[in-house]
Regions:
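A Rossmann-like FAD-binding core segment of flavoenzymes
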Residues: 29, 33-35, 75-99, 105, ...
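FAD-site-proximal beta/loop scaffold in flavoenzymes
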Residues: 130-155, 225, 229-232, 239-317, ...
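Beta1-alpha1 glycine-rich phosphate/pyrophosphate-binding loop at the start
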Residues: 2-80, 173-197
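A short, polar/charged loop-to-alpha-helix boundary motif
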Residues: 405-422
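Glycine-rich Rossmann-fold phosphate-binding loop(s) that bind the pyrophosphate
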Residues: 11-15, 41, 139-140, 163-168
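FAD-binding core/adjacent interface of flavoenzyme oxidoreductases
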Residues: 1-10, 29, 67-159, 217, ...
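Mid-to-C-terminal Rossmann-like scaffold of FAD/NAD(P)H-dependent oxidoreductases
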Residues: 2-6, 16-17, 290-405, 444, ...
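Cysteine/selenocysteine-centered motifs that mediate thiol-based redox chemistry or coordinate metal-sulfur cofactors
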Residues: 420-456
Length: 456
C-alpha cells in the first residue's frame, strides 16, 4: 500500500486553509491520498482580517463573528491543525520544518501561506521590541480585541492618531470617530496613494468634512511618553496629543525563514507560478506572495483576501493532481468611509497613470462627475469617476471611483472589461441595468467612458 503524500502547510488563514481543503477535495477525485498538517503560530484560524476595523467600529458584534470556520471544523474535515505552533526554520533540501517547540516535521510537499504581518517602525517600539502602551496595529483578531479594550479604557473624548492613510488607516479612522474619539490622520503622502491625485483629493475633503484632522506629507519622528505609555506623536511639522496611536503603514511578507533557499523579492515576497509552485516540492499562496497584474504583466504586492483565497484554491487543486491556475488580477480594490453626513465609497481597478506610462502606453484620462441615481430620486448622491484608456489602441487601462451610496461596486463592471482586455468603447456600450433608483438613463460609468473615447 502506497504511503500518503505528506503535506505541511504553514499558515491557517485564507490561503493556507483554502489550499488544504481544495487539496483534499481534488485528491478524492484524482484518487490520491494526502496527509495534511497545518501549522500556525496564532490562536485563530480562517478569520476575516478585513473585518477587524468594523469590529472596532461596532458594526460586528464580536470577534468570533469574523471566524469563518473553527479549528474543530478543519480537524473534522481530516486536517491535522496545530495552532500556537510557529515554524522557526525550514530545510528545503532535507524537506523538514522545525517548530518553536523543537518538533521536526518531514514533508513531501510544503505550502507556504505565512501571510504578511503589519510593519511596526522603530519609533513605536520599546527597547524589548514590543509596542509602547497605547500603540498597535490592526492585523489579527487579537489586535481587534486589544483595540476594543483600549477604546473602553480611554473612553469618549480621547484622541486617536492614525499613522497611514491607506485602506486600513481610513477604515480605522472611521471606527475611532464612531467610538467618540477625536481623530488625527498622519500620512507621508498626499492622501490615498493607490488613487490618482484628483481622486485622493476628493477623499481628503470627505475626511476633513467628517471632522478628521488630516496632515499630509507628515513623517513621524517619535512619540511623547509617560513612562512607557504614549501621550503624543511628533512629526516633522508638529505634535499632537494622543491617547492611542494606530500604526497602519503596510505589511511585509513573513518569509525570513526561507532566505537563501528560494528566490525572494527585495520586499521579501515569493513569486509562485500559476499553479502555486515556487520550487521543487515547495508551493506558496496568499499575502506572502506577489501577484501578476494582467494588464502590464508586472508582479506587484497586493495582500488581499480575494487573491489569497483564489491563490490557495488553485494551489491545492494543482498539488493534488488537478489543473486549476491563478492567472493574475486587474488590481481591483474597494473600501468605505462613513461617518455622520459623510459617506464615501472608494474603489479602483487597473493601472495608475504612472503604471500606464511605464508600460509604454499613451494614456488619456478624464474625471467625470455625476450622480449615483437619477437626479430626481432621493437616492441620488454625488459620484466621481476617473477613466483612462490608451490613445492608439483604445484599450481600457484604469478606472477609479469616489462617491456616495451605490458608487463603489460600479468598479466591477470596469474590472470585467479590463479582465477581458476590452476597450473603452466596450465599457461605454456594454449592456448595464437601469432603473431610476440605481442609475441615470446613461449610466455615469458609461458617460465617463464615452467622454474618454471621444478624446482618443
Amino acid at each position: 500500500m502506497t504511503a500518503p503524500t505528506r503535506v505541511v502547510v504553514i499558515g491557517a488563514d485564507a490561503a493556507g486553509m483554502s489550499a488544504a481543503h481544495q487539496a483534499l477535495r481534488t485528491a478524492r477525485r484524482t484518487g490520491r491520498e494526502l496527509a495534511i498538517t497545518v501549522l500556525d503560530k496564532g490562536t485563530h484560524t480562517s478569520y476575516s482580517a478585513c473585518g477587524i476595523p468594523y469590529l472596532m467600529a461596532g458594526d460586528v458584534a464580536s470577534a468570533e463573528d469574523l471566524v469563518a470556520r473553527s479549528g474543530d471544523a478543519h480537524r473534522d474535515a481530516g486536517i491535522d491543525l496545530r495552532m500556537s505552533t510557529e515554524v522557526v526554520s525550514a530545510d528545503l533540501s532535507a524537506r523538514t520544518v522545525t517548530t518553536d517547540g523543537g518538533d521536526v516535521l518531514e514533508y513531501d510537499e510544503l505550502v507556504v501561506a505565512t501571510g504578511a504581518p503589519a510593519v511596526v517602525p522603530d519609533w513605536a517600539l520599546r527597547p524589548d521590541g514590543t509596542p509602547y502602551g497605547g500603540v498597535g496595529t490592526v492585523k489579527t483578531l487579537d489586535d481587534g480585541a486589544s483595540w476594543l479594550e483600549r477604546f473602553a479604557e480611554v473612553g469618549d473624548g480621547g484622541h486617536v492618531v492614525v499613522v497611514g492613510a491607506g485602506y486600513v488607516g481610513v477604515e480605522v479612522a472611521e471606527a475611532a470617530l464612531r467610538k467618540g474619539f477625536g481623530v488625527t490622520v498622519l500620512t507621508r503622502t498626499r492622501g490615498m496613494s493607490m488613487l490618482e491625485d484628483e481622486m485622493s483629493d476628493l477623499v481628503n475633503v470627505g475626511l476633513c468634512d467628517a471632522g478628521i484632522e488630516l496632515v499630509l506629507g507628515a513623517e513621524v519622528t517619535g512619540l511623547e511618553l509617560d513612562g512607557d505609555r504614549v501621550t503624543g506623536v511628533h512629526w516633522d511639522g508638529g505634535t499632537r496629543d494622543a491617547d492611542l496611536v494606530v500604526v497602519a503603514i503596510g505589511v511585509r511578507p513573513a518569509t525570513a525563514f526561507l532566505e537563501g533557499q528560494v528566490e525572494l523579492t527585495d520586499g521579501g515576497a515569493l513569486r509562485p507560478d500559476p499553479h502555486g509552485r515556487v520550487a521543487d516540492h515547495v508551493w506558496a499562496a496568499g499575502d506572502c506572495c506577489e501577484v501578476r497584474r494582467r494588464l502590464d504583466d508586472e508582479w506587484v504586492f497586493r495582500p488581499l483576501g480575494t487573491h489569497a483565497n483564489k491563490h490557495g484554491r488553485a494551489l491545492g487543486d494543482s498539488l493534488a493532481g488537478g489543473s486549476l491556475t491563478f492567472d493574475g488580477m486587474t488590481d481591483t480594490s474597494i473600501t468605505r468611509f462613513s461617518y455622520g453626513e459623510v459617506h464615501l465609497e472608494i474603489a479602483r481597478t487597473g493601472l495608475s497613470r504612472s503604471d500606464a506610462e511605464a508600460a509604454g502606453h499613451e494614456p488619456v484620462a478624464l474625471l467625470t462627475e455625476g450622480t449615483t441615481a437619477s437626479g430626481y430620486m432621493p437616492e441620488a448622491e454625488p459620484i466621481a469617476l476617473w477613466v483612462m484608456a490608451d490613445r492608439t489602441t483604445r484599450r481600457l487601462l484604469g478606472v477609479q471611483v469616489v462617491g456616495g451610496h451605490g458608487a463603489g461596486k460600479r468598479i466591477d463592471a470596469a474590472a470585467a472589461v479590463l479582465w477581458a482586455g476590452g476597450t473603452v468603447d466596450d465599457l461605454a456600450w456594454m449592456d448595464l441595468a437601469y432603473a431610476p433608483p440605481f442609475s441615470t438613463a446613461w449610466e455615469i460609468l458609461q458617460v465617463a467612458a464615452r467622454r474618454v473615447a471621444e478624446r482618443l
